[in-house]
């Protein structure tokens, strides 16, 4: 079943982007320009409507997850030569944000960012996407009503609706921020044939982050040194890129894109020092993404290390803390 049947009921869609074919199972995003003025769909025929600068195509659709959550799929295609961002944009830029309005009893989770490109762009560190990317926002029922929470019979209100308001920065020589808006009846119709595995699966040709525990990766933080070890899964290249954690600063030279690891047989090891730990309520001490191989479709692992207890000399991380429930690798 596709979303084409409900496209006519979408109250928030103002236009389809000029010259861009919109998939039949997707809701095209209404566009508000950088100045905050909504584009007027009646001002010109389809072929003459202006595109959002820096974004060639955008749409929203629904998929289902293997853990029985629904997933809002935000599909963004940058204009050739432009790019959009990962959760840590690198030296400049901003990650996109997705604000969902949902009926009572439903809650949106944290956005899942697929594996990004990690490279130098115009002399700066860049983490993001220069080709089409699909950001995933899981949505779960939290009130426990009904034996089948996905049944349309459990709809709390005949007039219930969903709405998403996304802000997406796209950059080339300069940057623009576009607000993309879409919505429709609740519950939505999910795209047929989707069974997305958020933990270590793939979507849209890009790997989705696995947890350290599921990937068999162990990490420790002792004094100011982070050590990450795990199975290499047949690759000869392993790198670590930092997440956007306030206060966390790696002890690497300016302009370093990623920390390179070493591969020995079927295992890898990444080691680096920290200048400072992550700070703020609920923030981990260290977080980032382990990239196995070089292709966007190859595995990646999301790694977090909680704040350890300070040692007797006041040095942070004096008591090493594992990042997963796996036992430390044997020496």
Q: What residue ranges belong to the model's regions?
A:
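Extracellular/lumen-exposed scaffold segments
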Residues: 23-331
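Bacterial N-terminal signal peptides that target proteins for export
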Residues: 1-10
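N-terminal signal peptide c-region/cleavage motif recognized by signal peptidases
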Residues: 18-19
């Amino acid at each position: 079943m596709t979303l084409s049947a409900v496209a006519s009921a979408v109250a928030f869609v103002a236009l389809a982007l000029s010259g861009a074919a919109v998939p039949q199972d997707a809701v095209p995003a209404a566009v508000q320009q950088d100045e905050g003025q909504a584009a007027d769909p009646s001002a010109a025929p389809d072929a003459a409507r202006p595109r959002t600068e820096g974004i060639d195509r955008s749409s929203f659709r629904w998929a289902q997850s293997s853990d029985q959550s629904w997933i809002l799929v935000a599909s963004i295609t940058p204009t050739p030569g432009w790019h959009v961002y990962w959760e840590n944009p690198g030296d400049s830029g901003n990650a996109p944000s997705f604000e969902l309005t949902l009926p009572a009893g439903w809650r949106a989770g944290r956005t899942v960012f697929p594996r990004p490109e990690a490279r130098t762009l115009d002399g700066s560190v860049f983490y993001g996407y220069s080709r089409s990317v699909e950001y995933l926002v899981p949505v779960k029922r939290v009130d426990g009503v009904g034996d089948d929470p996905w049944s349309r019979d459990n709809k709390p209100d005949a007039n219930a609706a969903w709405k998403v308001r996304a802000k997406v920065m796209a950059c080339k020589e300069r940057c623009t921020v576009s607000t993309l808006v879409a919505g429709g009846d609740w519950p939505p119709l999910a795209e047929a044939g989707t069974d997305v595995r958020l933990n270590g699966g793939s979507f849209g040709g890009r790997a989705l982050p696995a947890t350290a525990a599921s990937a068999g990766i162990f990490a420790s933080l002792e004094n100011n040194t982070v050590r990450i070890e795990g199975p290499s899964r047949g690759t000869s290249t392993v790198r670590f890129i930092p997440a956007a954690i306030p206060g966390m600063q790696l002890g690497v030279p300016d302009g370093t894109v990623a920390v390179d690891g070493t591969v020995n047989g079927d295992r890898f090891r990444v080691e680096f020092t920290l200048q400072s730990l992550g700070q703020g309520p609920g923030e981990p001490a260290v977080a980032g993404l382990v990239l196995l191989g070089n292709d966007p479709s190859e595995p990646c692992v999301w790694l977090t290390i909680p704040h350890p207890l300070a040692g007797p000399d006041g040095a942070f991380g004096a008591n090493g803390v594992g990042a997963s429930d796996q036992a430390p690798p044997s020496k």
